[in-house]
Regions:
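Extracellular polysaccharide-degrading/modifying enzymes targeting complex plant/algal/animal polysaccharides
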Residues: 75, 79-384
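Secretory targeting signatures
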Residues: 1-69
Length: 384
């Protein structure tokens, strides 16, 4: 068969047809294009799955390889105004814009770039910052979905403060000089107790047990002493010896120690001991301004190195910034995760309304709201 355009020939051979060379070549080209289309469709499906998985990871916590893969391009990536600002203390950089794939490293820098009504999302990790939200209404600061975000107000004595503990003395006490003021000590994030008498611990909650306070002899009827004085009532059976007995056994000089005294029911005061009468077991203190009632006096002593006599007790010498600590079981303090609290607040809010802090935990620090109407602080755990 021959058509008028002279493009196709069909020659009968038996019961079938055979295409000529021009027909074969065009059909081969068509099949080749079809194969390419199938390959392209398959690649698009695979890329879509990879993109979806990557996006889902990005909404939880960036892994090192995620950031490494995008980090080289982050200098050219910009964040659209009104979209969330992301922060990652581990993998982020303050040189980046704060997108989900190119997060900032600090909340401080995110706040610098934020305006009212913005949302700042923090990826998982521990943050040590001291920032202030000022004049930014309706700002949201929250943890990423499923992420544990902790603002930590402590610093490692060895890693952050470069402290080196000295050799233990005969009592197992080591010393280190701190380059920053600290007012709480933690071992592996467990609070250690300031050196005190009678001894008590946080670990067994005896610090909250009234039996682990010493008592005065004053009652409603005996007028045993007056304001500015306190006479120790002696041993507490099964708990502690009396102050006089302790002094006689150890040589402790109570003068200069801090007496934490409950002298007025629900009111407690701390005063330095200024004098000691060993004849009747009475010490003196400045009674000005103390809440005083003639009943149920209790107290304990702290604030002297000589009071360190139990594992986990510590004392800080303000005169030379030296921390003294008796390690558990004679361990070397240089090998322990010892941290000191160095800040009262991590996040402050002032001159701003409607600010929300959500899903963020705090250890050894907290938040401070001032002049903040309609602000909220939700789904958070605060320790120490």
């Amino acid at each position: 068969m021959y058509n008028q355009g002279k493009k196709w020939w069909k020659v009968m051979e038996g019961s079938g047809f055979r295409t000529l060379s021009s027909i074969d070549s065009e059909r081969a080209a068509l099949l080749n294009q079809r194969r390419k289309a199938y390959v392209l469709i398959f690649m698009m499906i695979m890329l879509a799955q990879t993109s979806y998985i990557g996006a889902m990871q990005g909404w939880t916590y960036l892994q090192d390889n995620d950031v490494n893969a995008t980090g080289a391009a982050c200098s050219s990536i910009t964040r659209t105004s009104g979209t969330p600002i992301y922060v990652d203390a581990v993998n982020g950089s303050d040189d980046w814009e704060g997108t989900w794939s190119c997060p900032k490293a600090t909340l401080s820098d995110a706040l610098n770039d934020s305006v009212s009504d913005d949302e700042i999302i923090l990826y998982e990790g521990r943050y040590h910052e001291n920032v202030t939200v000022d004049n930014k209404d309706n700002l949201m600061i929250r943890a990423a979905d499923g992420a544990r975000v902790v603002f930590d107000g402590t610093k490692s004595i060895t890693d952050d403060l470069d402290g080196v503990w000295g050799t233990a003395d005969s009592d197992g006490i080591q010393e280190v000089t701190l380059t920053e003021d600290g007012w709480q000590l933690f071992l592996a994030y467990e609070e250690q107790v300031p050196a005190r008498w009678p001894n008590a611990q946080f670990s067994d909650e005896t610090v909250f047990n009234r039996s682990y306070w010493a008592e005065g002899t004053l009652t409603n009827s005996n007028n045993a002493y007056t304001q500015g004085w306190l006479t120790d009532a002696g041993p507490e059976t099964g708990v502690h010896s009396g102050l006089n007995e302790t002094i006689n056994a150890t040589g402790l000089n109570p003068v200069g120690a801090i007496a934490v005294m409950n002298l007025g029911s629900f009111r407690s005061n701390s005063r330095e001991i200024t004098d000691w009468n060993s004849a009747n077991g009475t010490f003196a203190y400045d009674g000005t301004g103390v809440g005083w009632k003639t009943k149920h006096h209790a107290y304990f002593l702290e604030g002297k190195r000589e009071l360190i006599d139990a594992d986990g007790e510590w004392w800080f010498d303000n005169s030379n910034n030296k921390l003294h600590y008796k390690t558990p079981s004679g361990q070397n303090a240089n090998d322990l995760d010892l941290r000191v609290k160095v800040q009262p607040f991590a996040i402050g809010v002032e001159n701003s309304d409607g600010v929300t802090i959500q899903g963020i935990d705090f250890f050894g620090t907290t938040v401070n709201f001032n002049e903040c109407d309609g602000c909220s602080f939700t789904n958070s755990t605060l320790e120490y």
